[in-house]
């Protein structure tokens, strides 16, 4: 009997604790609602409507954030996806192309995620405006690719840029240079959400402005926001009205994410007659990709699992290249009609990413984000396609930039392809030290980009510069210790070499 009483009192105390937590949650939601209403009153008449949509979207996300506890996946339910749910690209390609490529292409809209700044590479303004090859920017190359398609097949594939409030103004200024290109370019903006104080969980912003003290009070809430923002912009309905059926979504800094006609044909003319609503391009993991999100089978559906969702005890297992062999490239093909249906049903479910930041003044804040690929489980008949590594060529650092600027790649109509002169299809591993982090410093340290056709691995650390016509082969490690400087002379050929110490070349 005493055991029963103990269990009952324990249950009652747990029930009381959960009731208390529920009251706290409701109070907090009410406080946030009041703060958001105060912020909305500071919006001008032309800002009011879209600010209200943004703040309503934030409230929904915040409500979900308060409801969720602990890791969002039950590790025991994670299974490898069934064989037929991830198709090899070779199988898709083997079907060939239809005679009417132009009619298939005319059903497509290309969307590039263009919300990021170039700050990690020491550049101001949108990352898409950084020069990556022969003075062409990411945006230039994208426009060239789509113009080439439209001219070759006499089609009308539009380009849509999802900007953020950080990139919109600068991007729009530059777009006029493409007025004479055969590409219709549209833009829409990601939502703008308020950062919240890590302790109080209340918005840091006091008004809608984005200047002065308020500059750091707002953030774009991750690319998962594309579904709501695209819908709210009116572009979704416009394209459906024009007979478009699919969007191809990718990061603008992934130079491998070109329109693939074989994948598009598979979407438009499926072999089993059943259309896919969502296709995610995945590729094989290497040791460098262990943190990338992977496709799994979860409760009978394909699901993207990110490292942040994995319980700590299973992180090493998640990183295992032998168990989880593929990762998400963020190249996605999505049905427009399905996006419209799910958005109107409020049925797009994406896990919340909680991103902790420290503002310049030292205040700890969190921002709530979502990822576009996480919505795969909300769509019907989803599919993964295991594509060649060449479709994943992101430029996140100057080490990546060195690769794409080199003779490892040739440029044709805005697309980069691996040089036929390279004997192996793999990309060299390049690690440039902190002296090369900023694009400006990086460019100053290379008189010309070295020949890297036979390179396997390059590590550079410290104060190092490269003369013209340098050739790097095999494994090359160059380390200038603190206070030393190494100048690699013009015409030098370094093959399987370690260079250290001090080597100065001065003008006579």
Curated annotation (Swiss-Prot):
Pathway stated in the Swiss-Prot or TrEMBL entry: Glycan biosynthesis; glycogen biosynthesis
Catalytic machinery residues: 396
GO CC, one annotated term: nucleus
Phenotype upon changing residue 422 to H: No significant loss of activity
Keywords assigned by UniProt, alphabetized: Acetylation, Cytoplasm, Disease variant, Epilepsy, Magnesium, Metal-binding, Nucleotidyltransferase, Phosphoprotein, Transferase
GO biological process terms, semicolon-separated: brain development; glucose 1-phosphate metabolic process; glycogen biosynthetic process; glycogen metabolic process; UDP-alpha-D-glucose metabolic process; UDP-glucuronate biosynthetic process
PTM-bearing positions, type Phosphothreonine: 426
Residues with PTM Phosphoserine: 13, 434, 448, 461
Annotated effect of mutating residue 123 to S: No significant loss of activity
Pfam families reported in the protein's UniProt record: UDPGP (PF01704)
Region of interest called Oligomerization, as start-end residue ranges on this chain: 457-508
Residues recorded with modification N6-acetyllysine: 438
EC number: 2.7.7.9
Its job: UTP--glucose-1-phosphate uridylyltransferase catalyzing the conversion of glucose-1-phosphate into UDP-glucose, a crucial precursor for the production of glycogen.
Protein name per Swiss-Prot or TrEMBL: UTP--glucose-1-phosphate uridylyltransferase
Organism, as annotated: Homo sapiens
């Amino acid at each position: 009997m005493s055991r029963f009483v103990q269990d009952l009192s324990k249950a009652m105390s747990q029930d009381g604790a959960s009731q208390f937590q529920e009251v706290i949650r409701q109070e907090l939601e009410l406080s946030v609602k009041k703060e958001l209403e105060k912020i909305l009153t500071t919006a001008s008449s032309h800002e009011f409507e879209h600010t209200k949509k943004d703040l309503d979207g934030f409230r929904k996300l915040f409500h979900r954030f308060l409801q969720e506890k602990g890791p969002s996946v039950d590790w025991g339910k994670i299974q490898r996806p069934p064989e037929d749910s991830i198709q090899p690209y070779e199988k898709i390609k083997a079907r060939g192309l239809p005679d009417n490529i132009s009619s298939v292409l005319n059903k497509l809209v290309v969307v590039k995620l263009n919300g990021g700044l170039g700050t990690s590479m020491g550049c101001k303004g949108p990352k898409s405006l950084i020069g990556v090859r022969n003075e062409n920017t990411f945006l230039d190359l994208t426009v060239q690719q789509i113009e080439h398609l439209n001219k070759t097949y006499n089609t009308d594939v539009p380009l849509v840029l999802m900007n953020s409030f950080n990139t919109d103004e600068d991007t729009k200024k530059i777009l006029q240079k493409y007025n004479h290109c055969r590409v219709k370019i549209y833009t829409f903006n990601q939502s703008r959400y308020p950062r919240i104080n890590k302790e109080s969980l209340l918005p840091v912003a006091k008004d809608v402005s984005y200047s002065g003290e308020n500059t750091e009070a707002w953030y774009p809430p991750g690319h998962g926001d594309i579904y709501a923002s695209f819908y709210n912009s009116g572009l979704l309905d416009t394209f459906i009205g024009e007979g478009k059926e699919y969007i191809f979504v990718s990061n603008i800094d992934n130079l491998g994410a070109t329109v693939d006609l074989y994948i598009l044909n598979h979407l438009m003319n499926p072999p089993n007659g059943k259309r896919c609503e969502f296709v995610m391009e995945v590729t094989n993991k290497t040791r460098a990709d262990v943190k990338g999100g992977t496709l799994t089978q979860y409760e009978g559906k394909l699901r993207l699992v990110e490292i942040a969702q994995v319980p700590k005890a299973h992180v090493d297992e998640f990183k295992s290249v032998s168990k989880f062999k593929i990762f998400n490239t963020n190249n996605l093909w999505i049905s427009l009609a399905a996006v419209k249906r799910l958005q109107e049903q409020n049925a797009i479910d994406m896990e919340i990413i909680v991103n902790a930041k420290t503002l310049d003044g030292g205040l700890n804040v969190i921002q709530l984000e979502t990822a576009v690929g996480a919505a795969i489980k909300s769509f019907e008949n989803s599919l993964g396609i295991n594509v060649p590594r060449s479709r994943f060529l992101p430029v996140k650092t100057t080490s990546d930039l060195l690769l794409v600027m080199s003779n490892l790649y040739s440029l044709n109509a805005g697309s980069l392809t691996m040089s036929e002169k390279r004997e192996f299809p793999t990309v060299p591993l390049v690690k440039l030290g902190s002296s090369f982090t900023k694009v400006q410093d990086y460019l100053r340290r290379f008189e010309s980009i070295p020949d890297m056709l036979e390179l396997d691995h390059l590590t550079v650390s410290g104060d190092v510069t490269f003369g013209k016509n340098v050739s790097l082969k095999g494994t090359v490690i160059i380390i200038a210790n603190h206070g030393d400087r190494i100048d690699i002379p013009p015409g030098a050929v370094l093959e399987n070499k370690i260079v250290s110490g001090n080597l100065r070349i001065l003008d006579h």
